[in-house]
Amino acid sequence: MRTAKKAGLAAVALVLAGALAFGLLMLATPAAGNARQLAKAFDRQHGAPYPGVAVPYRFATALEATEDHRFKEEPGVDPVAVLRVVYGTVTRRGDQGGATLYQQLAKMLYTPGQANLTAEAKQVALAIKLKYSYSRPEILRLYADVAYFGNGFYGLAEASCGYFGVPPDRLSWPQAALLAGLVQGPSADDPIQHPAAGLAREQHVMGRLVAIGAVSQPQANAYLQIPLSTLLVNAGACVG
């Protein structure tokens, strides 16, 4: 009986300590109300345009499907994924995936280039602040404006023009899938420098689109038959 009571008290103490630590972390991290200003400064630094316009449906759907399929329901973070990230950081095995779009945006805007437990903790707190400071369309817009897509392209507008020669609202499903697949490994999966890797990512994202019902399996099969050279035929020359 005493053992159970002690265990219960220890559990309560652990919860209280965690809540206190989380509260201190929220106080120690900046407010997220300046995310737009940071995004603009980020794009100026990299010589990229800051369109600040709504993200087109196809790219938004492909991004959510492959990077964060619970984007519309989650509180900004995925607790299980956070534990995987911490484990990956401690063991130096990478972040193990699973960071939400909010966390990824927090990393890009507030802790770029940092890969340690302190940075991961800040990203969790900032992700929650971003969640409650901006609407989902605004988060997607900020993400698309600062994400790196490889080959020197920062932001969706520059990547869409650079790879396909079209503005983002004219992306086809296979083009949108290819771009959405680049955000995790923009250099390694660059379809110009590493076409096989780029195609593999396109296939993965297309599979996710089928899984959520955005495209049918026959449609996906047809899209994946389009040669990469055809998708990239107008690279660098945007069409109005």
Tell me what each language-model feature is.
Residues 1-240:
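Juxtamembrane regions of bacterial inner-membrane/periplasmic proteins
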